[in-house]
Regions:
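Alpha-helix C-terminal capping segments
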Residues: 1-10, 108-117, 207-215
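Buried hydrophobic positions in well-ordered alpha/beta secondary-structure cores of metabolic enzymes
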Residues: 4, 27, 63, 82, ...
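Glycine-rich beta-alpha junction loops
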Residues: 67, 100-104, 126-131, 151, ...
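Active-site-adjacent helical/loop segments in soluble small-molecule enzymes
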Residues: 161-219
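Glycine-rich ThDP/TPP pyrophosphate-binding loop and its adjacent helix/strand module
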Residues: 83-115, 119
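Catalytic phosphate/nucleotide-handling subdomain of diverse soluble enzymes
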Residues: 210-240
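Small/polar-residue-rich loop-to-helix segments that shape phosphate-bearing ligand pockets
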Residues: 12-95, 126-179, 183
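A conserved regulatory-domain signal marking ACT and ACT-like small-molecule sensing domains
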Residues: 232-333
Length: 333
């Protein structure tokens, strides 16, 4: 979008209908009068297909967002700046991590990095719910994933490019993946400790450090933070996923005796002194001795979980921990 306005070249930019509003606003801001936005499809791949069809119908040039030599080269300039800064400081980079979606960034960065510093290890980081580059590595070529999770929407791609796959296969040393809970905790850490606002896709490289922390002690590491389009409206969701990942927030279905004082007993006997109830849903049933309650509990310390489970079992031996009930759990989180 910025290039369109800078070079005075009109363009139509296709994005999924699920694109966060903040990202749409930024595209409008940088594109100005030279960038029209078309929101089509629920995923990146559906939107890309629509863009290709539109370009054919209207006799326009389609520019792939990642599987294009010029796009790859442009993203590779990030590595040029990184290694030039390292050279000026006399620093040897042992490890470089970058997010992987369609593969444009990791391709451009890795091919330059291996040219100027062959000993630098390159790790590509995918979201656990959208491991399209790993699928390409496993099948000796790009394949389309049937479904993907769109939490890290900036890298939620069903199929990587042919060119990006070839470059990554040759230059990337390892692929790892990070789940949405770890990504969420990383987003909050970057904001609270460093004042950095980052979207889920942009946080993946830093999140991956948790996975390899025992292997990288004493090394010089660069994480490319690629994307700050974090819609403030998503922060509640991100905090929720982080608390669950950290083992602090839990959801249960517990059978309560249908008599006065049952809730008071639960609070006094089950909760720790610093624990909190974050959700409580209950409908009293007539002519029944007990009734199911959906309850969310926030612990002050994740080490208290085992004791909480023991007390819950004593209160209701048939209670349900919804973390093991994926279909129900996803309705809450």
């Amino acid at each position: 979008a910025y290039t369109c306005q800078e070079l005075k070249i009109p363009a139509t930019i296709f994005m999924p209908t699920t694109t966060p509003q903040q990202k749409i606003t930024q595209v409008k801001f940088f594109g100005g009068d030279y960038a029209d936005i078309a929101l089509v499809g629920d995923t990146f791949d559906e939107s890309a297909t629509a863009a290709i069809d539109y370009a054919r119908r209207e006799n326009k040039t389609f520019i792939d967002p990642f599987d294009n030599p010029d796009v790859i080269s442009g993203q590779g300039t990030v590595a040029v700046e990184i290694f030039e800064a390292a050279r000026q400081e006399g620093i040897k980079i042992d490890l470089l991590l970058a997010a992987v979606g369609g593969g444009g960034l990791i391709s451009g960065v890795s091919v330059y990095a291996k040219h100027v510093s062959p000993e630098t290890k390159i790790i590509g980081v995918e979201a656990s719910g959208a491991r399209s580059m790993q699928a390409a590595f496993d099948h000796a070529g790009p394949i389309k994933l049937e479904t993907i999770d769109k939490f890290a929407d900036g890298i939620a791609v069903q199929k990587v490019g042919q060119l990006t796959y070839q470059i990554a296969k040759e230059n990337v040393d390892e692929l790892v993946n990070t789940d949405e809970g770890l990504i969420s905790s990383t987003i909050l850490d970057l904001y609270s400790k460093q004042g950095i606002v980052v979207e889920p896709a942009g946080a993946t490289s830093v999140a991956a450090l948790e996975l390899i922390k025992d292997e990288i002690k004493g090394q010089t590491i660069v994480c490319i933070i690629s994307g700050g389009n974090n819609d403030i409206n998503r922060m509640q969701e991100i905090e929720e996923k982080s608390l669950i990942y950290e083992g602090l927030k839990h959801y249960f279905v517990v059978n309560f005796p249908q008599r006065p004082g049952a809730l008071r007993e639960f609070v006094n006997d089950i909760l720790g002194p610093h624990d909190d109830i974050t959700r409580f849903e209950y409908i009293k049933r007539a002519n029944k001795g007990t009734g199911p309650v959906l309850i969310g509990i926030l612990l002050s310390n994740k080490q208290d979980q085992a004791q909480l489970i023991e007390r819950l079992a004593a209160f209701d031996s048939k209670f349900i921990d919804l973390k093991g009930q994926e279909s129900l759990y996803n309705l809450l989180v």
